[in-house]
UniProtKB/Swiss-Prot annotation:
Cellular compartments per GO CC: plasma membrane
Pfam families on file: Cons_hypoth698
Superkingdom of the source species: Bacteria
Membrane topology summary: Multi-pass membrane protein
Family of the protein in this entry: Belongs to the UPF0324 family.
Keyword Transmembrane: yes
Subcellular location(s) of the protein: Cell membrane
Protein's organism: Helicobacter hepaticus (strain ATCC 51449 / 3B1)
Protein name in UniProt: UPF0324 membrane protein HH_1161
């Protein structure tokens, strides 16, 4: 028992070291990259050594704790970045454009993934990462679907690439004065189209008005993660039920009942609860900032743990089609969002 706890502790300390390193690199060397992204890159670089590390130090329990428990806690605490009052300032059109983007891009990912004959789970992961909020959304859906880390990693890889492209491309277009948009409209455009919160903050620095609006639009998309996760869970449950009814070879019993049970992502309600608390209780700034930092730490832990568990053979096998899906969704995001902004604002 003591040996197993020691292995668990080694796993947590391992994640802590590389999580703190990710935060340091992000803050000093690469401020344009989220520490979450740096975390998964460090984990991925170390993944070939993970089997031997686990064999010698039995760190699996600590790594699993980081990848699952701390992930969910991080998503719950992520609600501290958002208030309902900020979302309300956008008005109906601001909410609708976020809703159209999230729903449209996610549905497009499902159909385009089928056309490309891509793995269903990867299509969903790339779809939610593009539609909602990049890494955090992919991690939340991974926890709901219980997918293999390699699938999440390949989805994250291409979301990072196109998020960075968008972060560079949109300010370049703004300064070239190509599109007939004012700063407010640019804020809507950037907030509704880019993948990561960090991408939005970086790209929207073109003006104070654009940045304020862009962040609120982005957080509105983040809030829509909750109903989307619940809808996905319910649809998967119904599809599993239908599959079981059509397959007479599947045995009945407790094990089967568990496999076919409706999974409710309770952490999504926790996320929503923190948003509500943050909206109606005037917490001291130190409490809000500490909660936000705790969320970031938990999510970086999860990203390092996820990167460690990458199966590179699977990662490579999913590569080309996943790139194609992420590219098509990026084009849809750019042109679709611009069209909606032009029409609605």
């Amino acid at each position: 028992m003591a040996y197993r706890f020691q292995g668990f502790l080694y796993g947590i300390l391992f994640l802590a070291f590389f999580s703190l390193l990710s935060l340091f690199i992000s803050a000093t060397l690469t401020p344009f990259l989220s520490p979450l992204i740096i975390g998964i890159l460090l984990g991925a670089a170390l993944s070939p050594f993970y089997p031997k590390l686990n064999q010698h130090y039995d760190i699996q329990a600590g790594i699993t704790f980081g990848a699952k428990k701390l992930l969910r806690l991080g998503i719950i605490l992520y609600g501290s970045y958002i208030t309902l009052g900020e979302i309300a300032t956008l008005g109906l059109n601001g909410f609708l454009i976020s809703l159209f983007i999230v729903a449209g891009v996610f549905i497009a990912a499902i159909f385009i993934g089928k056309m490309l004959k891509l793995d269903n789970e990867i299509s969903l992961l790339v779809g939610i990462g593009s539609a909602v909020c990049g890494a955090a959304a992919i991690l939340a859906l991974e926890s709901t679907l219980k997918t293999h880390p390699s699938k999440s990693s390949v989805a994250l890889g291409f979301i990072v690439i196109f998020g960075l492209i968008g972060m560079i491309l949109l300010p370049a277009i703004y300064y070239a004065n190509i599109l007939p948009l004012n700063d407010y409209q640019w804020g809507i455009f950037i907030g509704a189209s880019l993948h990561e919160v960090a991408n939005v903050v970086g790209a929207a620095a073109i003006s104070p008005e654009s940045q304020n609006v862009a962040i609120i639009v982005k957080m509105t998309r983040v809030v829509l993660l909750v109903p989307l996760l619940l809808i996905i869970s319910y649809i998967i449950f119904k599809l599993n039920q239908k599959r079981v009814q059509n397959d007479t070879n599947i045995p009945n019993g407790d094990t089967h009942a568990k496999q076919n049970a409706l999974y409710i992502p309770y952490f999504a309600f926790g996320f929503l609860g923190v948003i509500v608390l943050n909206s109606f209780i005037d917490f001291p700034p130190v409490v809000v900032e500490s909660t936000q930092f705790a969320s970031k730490i938990c999510l970086v832990f999860a990203m390092v743990a996820l990167g460690l568990q990458i199966d590179w053979q699977k990662f490579i096998s999913f590569g080309a089609k996943t790139f194609a899906l992420a590219l098509i969704l990026f084009i849809i995001l750019m042109f679709g969002t611009y069209g909606l902004v032009y029409i609605m604002f």
